[in-house]
Regions:
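Short, catalytically relevant binding-site loops at active-site mouths
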Residues: 63-66, 87-89
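Short glycine-rich phosphate-binding loop at a beta-alpha junction
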Residues: 53-61
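Short, glycine/charge-rich flexible loops or terminal/linker lids adjacent to PRPP-binding catalytic cores
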Residues: 78-107
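Glycine-enriched loop-and-adjacent helix/strand subsegments that border the catalytic/binding cleft
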Residues: 6-8, 60, 81-84
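Hydrophobic alpha-helical segments and helix-packing faces
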Residues: 38, 60-64
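Short, hydrophobic/aromatic-rich beta-strand segments within well-structured domains
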Residues: 57-58, 69-70, 81
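Short Gly/Thr/Asp-enriched flexible loops that form oxyanion-binding sites at enzyme active sites
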Residues: 66-75
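Active-site-facing substrate-recognition patch
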Residues: 1-54
Length: 107
């Protein structure tokens, strides 16, 4: 497997190189299952955004959910919000925006 070396938040990781299209490859930065990386990245990101500089925390589903959860935990935020690709039945009045994903090539 080809990898891309990265040093982030004081930690070293080897990102797997993943083919998205014939012309596009990405280093997949995935925090699922890496508690040490998630905690360290959340700590460093929170240093960049003072608590009084935002009203809400928002992230895209799904790979960043552990990171925003840890950021909320460390900052004492009671809530954070997840942007999804589509509405679910349990969402009574979702905000809807059309966008295109680079990894799935779908709207």
């Amino acid at each position: 497997m080809h990898t891309y070396p990265i040093d982030v938040a004081g930690l070293h990781r080897e990102l797997p190189i993943c083919k998205v299209t014939d012309d596009l490859y990405i280093g997949a930065f995935i925090v699922f299952g890496d508690a040490e990386l998630t905690v360290a990245c959340a700590r460093e990101l929170l240093k960049l955004v003072p608590a009084d500089s935002y009203d809400y925390m928002l992230t895209a589903e799904a790979k960043s959910i552990p990171l925003i959860h840890e950021m909320a935990r460390q900052s004492g935020a009671a809530k954070y919000f997840i942007a999804r690709k589509g509405p679910k039945a349990y969402m009574p009045d979702p905000l809807h925006v059309v966008d295109k994903s680079i990894t799935t090539a779908e709207e």
